[in-house]
């Protein structure tokens, strides 16, 4: 499968400090690619350079054949961005906001279909402040789809959500990928990365340490002799929580 993102020597500096240190990676068309790392590793800065939100101080990033540094406007036309702290307008309904976002791209959007995709049809006339945490995150993703992006960037999309809302969002992310959209996400949750991502890049101190599928990374660790005491259960506490509170969406 061909690459839709190619990154070579990508670098970001703030004064004397280099926070992203000449990293290389590629993302295949149609995959979910995750970037894992501790706070301060450079994950968000890397995404922001790919999104043309921060200047690139060294190296290159190419998305769908377009150089990010040379053509930032063209890049913004083909990507969707869901930030950690997405801000919406308090005085506009969900329907009005999606129409406004679409107008910024000069595109038309079927608002009803988009709200149905994120299971917010009944909230079409509501304001963002009236939504639960999970509903806000789903609406944030809906807002990134108004321009039919080829690549969707999600920065810690399930932070602050309860287990049930997290699983609902996972299903939405997988559905979007099945429709042909490439997804690049950052996360602190190992279970999320293992469930969603086809491949992962693990970052630390501004560098990419390794890139591979979750399965291969685990197998490589085991081959090095890693062992831990493990009790295999058929369910976990998160499963209990969701079973007791209901499997239908209750955000």
For each feature predicted by the language model, list its residue ranges.
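Catalytic Walker B motif of ABC-type/P-loop ATPase nucleotide-binding domains
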Residues: 152-156
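Conserved ABC ATPase "signature" region
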Residues: 99, 103, 108-123
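ABC ATPase "signature
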Residues: 211-212
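Conserved catalytic motifs of ABC-family nucleotide-binding domains
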Residues: 148
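Conserved ABC ATPase signature
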Residues: 127-131
């Amino acid at each position: 499968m061909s690459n839709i993102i190619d990154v070579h020597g990508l670098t970001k500096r703030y004064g004397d400090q280099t926070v992203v240190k000449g990293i290389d990676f590629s993302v295949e068309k149609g995959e979910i690619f995750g970037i894992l790392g501790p706070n301060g590793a450079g994950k968000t800065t890397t995404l922001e350079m790919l999104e043309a939100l921060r200047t690139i101080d060294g190296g290159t990033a190419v998305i769908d054949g377009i150089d990010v540094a040379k053509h930032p406007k063209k890049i913004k036309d083909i990507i969707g961005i869901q930030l950690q702290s997405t801000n919406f307008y308090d005085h506009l309904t969900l329907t009005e906001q999606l129409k406004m976002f679409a107008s910024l791209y000069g595109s038309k959007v079927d608002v009803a279909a988009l709200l149905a995709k994120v299971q917010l049809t009944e909230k079409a006339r509501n304001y963002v402040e009236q939504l639960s945490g999970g509903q806000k995150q789903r609406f944030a993703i809906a807002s990134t789809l108004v321009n039919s992006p080829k690549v969707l960037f999600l920065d810690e999309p399930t932070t602050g959500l309860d287990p049930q809302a997290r699983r609902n969002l996972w299903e939405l992310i997988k559905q979007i990928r099945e429709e042909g959209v490439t997804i690049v996400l950052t996360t602190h949750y190992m279970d999320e990365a293992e469930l969603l991502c086809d491949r992962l890049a693990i970052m630390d101190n501004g560098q990419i340490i390794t890139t591979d599928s979750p399965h291969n990374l685990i197998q490589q660790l085991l081959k090095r002799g890693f062992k831990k005491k493990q009790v295999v259960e058929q369910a976990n506490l998160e499963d209990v929580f969701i079973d007791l509170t209901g499997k239908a969406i209750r955000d």
